[in-house]
């Protein structure tokens, strides 16, 4: 905002795929493999999921040593992934024991921090909790599912300056904070 004080932001935080044209949305951030060919997109980051739990959960339930052991643990899943109870690793998919599911990444992290089970999220979303030991990464040696994150915007011949400026800000931010 300091770079462009004239900009006004109206931010909606949800994980639903809103129709940009129908709702007159300038930019959406999508963590997905894109399917809508009617939108333009700027790739911001490629993020890998990591798997984690609280120290208390692991002390009580043990730490899984491989992906197949996830089926015997309580797992907190993201309900907007389909199917939500299948976690993808580089070379395999594992059906997990889904005890809680939510469409809120924030809620998933909070539940994991409270000891409710094992969860999966992009590493950048939980790195601070690894640093302060509120969460412990499990299976770090396994190659987790990787997902691109894009800034998507309406397909038109002219991109307004405010959209270009915001996309540049996002791109610079994620380049600096990988």
Question: For each of these PLM feature ranges, what is it?
Answer:
Residues 2-6, 132, 172, 176:
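Conserved amphipathic alpha-helical interaction elements at protein-protein interfaces in regulatory
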Residues 29, 109, 127, 153, ...:
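A cross-family signal for key residues in well-ordered alpha-helices
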Residues 1-37:
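Central regulatory/effector-binding core of bacterial HTH transcription factors
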Residues 10-14, 138, 152:
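Solvent-exposed beta-strand sheet faces enriched in polar/charged residues
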Residues 139-178:
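A late-sequence structural motif
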Residues 34-146, 176-177:
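C-terminal regulatory
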């Amino acid at each position: 905002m300091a770079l462009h004080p004239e900009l006004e932001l109206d931010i909606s935080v949800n994980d639903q795929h809103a129709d940009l044209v129908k709702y007159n949305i300038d930019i959406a951030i999508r963590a997905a493999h894109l399917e809508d060919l009617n939108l333009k997109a700027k790739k911001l980051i490629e993020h890998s999921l990591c798997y984690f739990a609280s120290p208390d959960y692991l002390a009580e339930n043990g730490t899984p040593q491989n992906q197949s052991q996830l089926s015997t643990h309580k797992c907190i899943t993201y309900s907007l992934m389909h199917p939500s109870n299948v976690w993808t690793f580089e070379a395999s998919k594992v059906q997990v024991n889904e005890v809680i599911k939510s469409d809120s990444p924030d809620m998933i992290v909070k539940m994991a921090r409270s000891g409710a089970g094992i969860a999966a999220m992009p590493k950048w979303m939980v790195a601070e909790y690894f640093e302060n030991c509120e969460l412990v990464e499990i299976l770090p040696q396994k190659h987790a599912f990787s997902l691109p994150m894009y800034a998507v915007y309406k397909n038109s011949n002219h991109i307004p300056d405010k959209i270009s400026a915001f996309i540049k800000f996002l791109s610079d931010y994620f380049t600096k904070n990988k």
